[in-house]
Swiss-Prot record:
Protein name according to UniProt: tRNA pseudouridine synthase B
Keyword Oxidoreductase on entry: no
EC numbers: 5.4.99.25
Catalytic function, reaction form: uridine(55) in tRNA = pseudouridine(55) in tRNA
Family: Belongs to the pseudouridine synthase TruB family. Type 1 subfamily.
Amino acid sequence: MSRPRRRGRDIHGVLLLDKPQGMSSNDVLQKVKRIYNANRAGHTGALDPLATGMLPICLGEATKFSQYLLDSDKRYRVIARLGQRTDTSDADGQIVQERPVTFSAEQLASALETFRGDIEQIPSMYSALKYQGKKLYEYARQGIEVPREARPITVYELLFIRHEGNELELEVHCSKGTYIRTIIDDLGEKLGCGAHVTYLRRLTVSKYPVDRMVTLEHLQTLVAQAEQQGVPAAQWLDPLLMPMDSPASDYPVVNLPLTSSVYFKNGNPVRTTGAPLKGLVRVTEGEDDKFIGMGEIDDEGRVAPRRLVVEYPA
């Protein structure tokens, strides 16, 4: 007879993890989930094993609002190895072509300019996008290439940092859906020498503060210290979390009086003052502005519930 599954904690919020190199996003997600003993956890946009940096991990009810971070802008620092092209467009892949690096500074500046602004990008075969229900990297590992449509992306800023020998360092501020590996691969082809990513760090996601990032090692140290001092680890871990509504921080706030919020939480649209004319809104209730979910302004100007927070007993 199987043992009953142990129930985790109903903990809600967003941890800004500084993902280490060499681990998959799912691996670090599972470690954080165990450290927090959380019932539910999910990340908001995977980083390649080679990459480091900001990986927001949503716990509990915050997972309902993680989709809003998937749509947010991101900023990266990347170092490319020039003269070598790999099958994965990064250092984890196999070298498939080597060519001399002969471009001039003017040619580099001209090539970089073509990647700024609104452009279209054909995703790498080594990505998690799906074709006929199967992830592209699964086809790639079988040596199968399938058709991919170009997707519109926006590169808000592409900063040249340095070019030394066969290394090129850039900083990229981009929209959702942008593959930095693909930018580097495409840039290498435009320069005629090939290139692949050797270092990639996600600096920021949306407007999250960089100084709130924490490492796995720090979390594990806190757990060990709490155990030594005989205090619950949650006492030190939970203050590290950002609010559960922080993934939707770009949306305007509508505050409902308690007399109206009870109807909203039961799935009914409600009328209120001071709401925008249309679009999604964060909905709070009462004088303490407690977050209760996401709403959308309907055709009659009412706030209709879209995603609601489940209230757990304390």
